[in-house]
């Protein structure tokens, strides 16, 4: 890989080859104004330098020598004299030196992107000679060159390997960052150097980048010839070396020489010799092997879904029972069933357990039978034979059962919910085969096993005692989860209560079984937006090609050891993570220890996931990452990945919050960022305080902002207003979201819509992907009173309508003559016959597009319309997204940087 270009930030982030991906989201290039017909811009000074919110378009000069030396803001934001006075220019043309001219000037300087500006700070001299220079360190001052949100879209610092590291020169030889990211892309050779750096060494692993294989295909090796090292059991990969005329290979992890299997160079399909240099496992770092018999303890299990549906009064009245029954029925074709072995079962739960035996299609009696069990202490299985039925054999009867299920309980007055007992009963039913228990509930489990009580106390919120509410109230939920894990049973929770439901306790079941907690506070099917959101998400959930009976292990070069694992699974032994089901919408963090001095120029870390596909095939997904080593602290800092580091500390903060409390978690985050800044200043900035600044390398400039945003996140922030269930659900997200979604959840995306560039909201000519406007920093200083903004944290979207928004804007976007008629709250945007409405809708939809971020997710965020001068509660909620502002018991970004400067 070529050495990175000088100057920060160089083109494409850090001079990284295209194979490793520049920012996934297509950012809008700046429009060049021509004399022809002009697109509408709804702003007063749409592109005026320093005004408006379009930071990345020029209001804010990002990273570069003079980052963020903002020109003075205009005094107030004058509204244009007359909107649409000139019919040719429907909404006031942009004034002043349009960014267009600047773009042309920068273009002449070879800098087509306005956020890649001159002059560069001088790179630091490396301390030790290398065959290939690693990334250079670019010092910057965080105070005089403020953070620009566009920096969060840069790819990680490139992984610079010596030439000839891989056995064949394949562009796919090293693992792409969407699957595995290391916090350090240059690894210290000793434990003492790592300790001196104060940086963490960890991997962020996301083995799947989509819910379905077809959306993210990787090479599959079907010949069942799997070559592994005899000693360390690593899989053959692009970084091994061949010896003895290719008859033996040396392991790149432990150096042992192994024999090449006889069938390695034989094409079983064509029955003739094959070209070894074309084998996927020697060219691709991400591959999947079809596993032979010896990788199975038992025949591959079928896909099993057991639905535990709350049918108590709360669940019938809010429409959950009817909506989930209808949604399962409509999704039967989407549930993976290629091998025709998929099985389904249903248990309805109130103060009793209701089992359903569903006959095969074409039987004499096609009516489902309901069997009620009221003994909750030892729930027995009535007739286990046909309680779990094969989908393809009972399809019609399953449909008619789901139609009837809604009616069976429509007049119930039963407020009991024996979900703990139902889980025990469900476990007995599916433990022999393993599978998924999907819980759909609107109530607190209040009778039977694992009964819980209302323990939330408003007086405790915001105090040190609040932490006890985030811990499990009943040991059943942890001990039962471990039992489930051993029997290959996974639990997913869909929770819908409008009252306290104890998410803190219930979320333990998914946490230890490879499941997930999905939380829908105050959900009601009578609101169309609620019903549609859940139906879309639940249908995608059922269609997801999950893995079954899976284990994950990470192996590495001698001298490295996997130390701690974070994520939703059960840690079965020191280095083995067990997943009864392997989801496709989660990421995992593994901390790596350096136990002995590393003498090699390159280390490798290999993740392997052994699993059964939902089509009954045993497979191993292998992801191999090679990283250069260094004895030089400057190299370690210059190659550190700020987003991977933030992900690691997000998991650490959740662990600390659940173990010690929220205040210790927040304090730990603050003291960590202070420690990193102080270490950098002392070791690499020569201890000098140049003009009272705050020095940090260019590639880590976002870290102080991300740490502040974490401290302000719903899961961790200091507040007496946050319901415990909301907080617990947020902690679940902070410890499971894939990296791109976690970054957005911590530091949401904000787009200025009223003055978006001409190309935004339209398909890109080359890729066909909708172009998003440039993101804007999350500060109210960036928001103009006549503006329209989209704020999106990946879970919720807000459409912010400024108090002085002009009538034409309201008419074009919402189809209403006057802002006073605009209803606030949850809604879908109307589909109107005008260009601007279509572009706004396209941006809202594209912002939800998980696939373009390289992740699998079922979440469809709600869209809330917020008026700046409208309903105060909603406005305050939206304003919590402005993480750079001062808020309830928390500091602004400027104050935060000032306090960091004092502490350093």
Swiss-Prot record:
Keywords per UniProt: Cytoplasm, Cytoplasmic vesicle, Endoplasmic reticulum, ER-Golgi transport, Golgi apparatus, Membrane, Metal-binding, Protein transport, Transport, Zinc
Chain residue ranges for the region called Zinc finger-like: 229-254
Residues at which Zn(2+) binds: 229, 232, 251, 254
Top-rank taxon: Eukaryota
GO molecular function, one term: SNARE binding
Compositional bias annotation for Low complexity: 1-18
Membrane topology, record value: Peripheral membrane protein
Annotated compartments: Cytoplasm; Cytoplasmic vesicle, COPII-coated vesicle membrane; Endoplasmic reticulum membrane; Golgi apparatus membrane
A GO biological process held by the record: COPII-coated vesicle cargo loading
UniProt-annotated stretches for the region Disordered: 1-39
One GO CC annotation: Golgi membrane
Role summary: Component of the coat protein complex II (COPII) which promotes the formation of transport vesicles from the endoplasmic reticulum (ER). The coat has two main functions, the physical deformation of the endoplasmic reticulum membrane into vesicles and the selection of cargo molecules.
Similarity comment text for this entry: Belongs to the SEC23/SEC24 family. SEC24 subfamily.
PANTHER family, sorted: SEC24-RELATED PROTEIN, SECRETORY 24AB, ISOFORM A
Subunit structure: The COPII coat is composed of at least 5 proteins: the sec23/24 complex, the sec13/31 complex, and the protein sar1. Golgi apparatus membrane; Peripheral membrane protein; Cytoplasmic side.
Protein name: Protein transport protein sec24
Source organism of the structure: Aspergillus terreus (strain NIH 2624 / FGSC A1156)
